[in-house]
Amino acid sequence: MFWDFKHRIEQSVTNFRETTYEAFSRCKLFLKTLPKTSIFFLTVIILECLLIICFEGYCIGQFRTVELLKNLGIDSLPISLTLFIFACFFILYLCVEALSSKNIIEIIGLLCIHVALFIYSIVQISELAEIQKVFLSKTQSSLNPITLILNRHEAGNEGIYFILEVPKRIKPFLIALPVILGVASVMLGFLAHGMNKAYGWVIYKKIGPELRMRRRYLVYKIYVTLLKIDIYFFLGVTVQYVMVLPEDAVVEFVLTILVLPLTVLILTLSFNSVSSENMFLMMTVQFFYVCGIPYILFKIIRMYTSTQKEYYASSKQMITTFSVITLLLLLFTIAIGFACSHNFKKGLKEYCM
């Protein structure tokens, strides 16, 4: 029995080594096939993501030390910081996929994501000041440091620490985020221009010299890229809606939770409908996308006009920004979706399979 157990462990270790070696071999082979411009592009993405993850992780850690924020319902900034970290992994995945398939449309999509995150990172800085104001109003404190220190026994050490220490510690890192994204975007844009020359022939080689078919294929690739970007933004905005709901909004909480699997299902059907040129399925998902417009508008308006608008005071700037970006993306997805459906049954299907 002992030898059996030992043999199983040795077999598991051997399998792990073989799998790891195979993964490294594939990675090495992948890097060898890339031109220098693409390697520089990937390097910039990796360095950028590492810096953002480190900075955001530090900021989240500082917020998590103040339990009072969660009790007061104003811990919205850590949620947006966490979404930023997930955005880094998403960007890295999209970059590797774009480079491996030599897809210049996805490269351009990456640049668009950077612009959106750049705007979002600027809003994060102003949101910190808003959270401070809401914290002070809910704890009935003053922003005067002398008053805070004199009343520290009444207000609580945790509140004093948040007002005096946390913003001072994390603000430089929040300011660094748009700087990193801005510099990286400029570098990536310059590299993408060079990659366009190398990858520009991919569509021509796949489709041939027929101009109309190439344009149809280009529209198809734009739509597929949009759907991939939609995955992050659609799910991200829904998660934010869930996290900031009041505790007594049970029905709305359940309905918002149900939007998550519905979003995944609709996006999956979108991929299938456009690749199989299924008009009925395409119109079905388009209908759901159109329904998403009033849904997002309702969520935005509700934060500013409902009787519980004070509950959203510390997070409405970030959620509004993310919602507007998602809404614009949704409108663009609908428009390109109709353009794709117009190209059905015109010989493009064989190139999309």
Swiss-Prot record:
Compartmental location: Golgi apparatus membrane
Entry's Gene Ontology cellular component terms: Golgi apparatus; Golgi membrane; plasma membrane
TM region(s), chain numbering: 39-59, 76-96, 103-123, 172-192, 226-246, 249-269, 281-301, 318-338
Topology of the protein relative to the lipid bilayer: Multi-pass membrane protein
Keywords, comma-separated and alphabetical: Golgi apparatus, Membrane, Transmembrane, Transmembrane helix
Family annotation (InterPro entries): UPF0658_Golgi (IPR040410)
PANTHER family per the UniProt record, alphabetical: UPF0658 GOLGI APPARATUS MEMBRANE PROTEIN C1952.10C-RELATED (PTHR34391:SF1)
Family: Belongs to the UPF0658 family.
Protein name: UPF0658 Golgi apparatus membrane protein C23H3.04
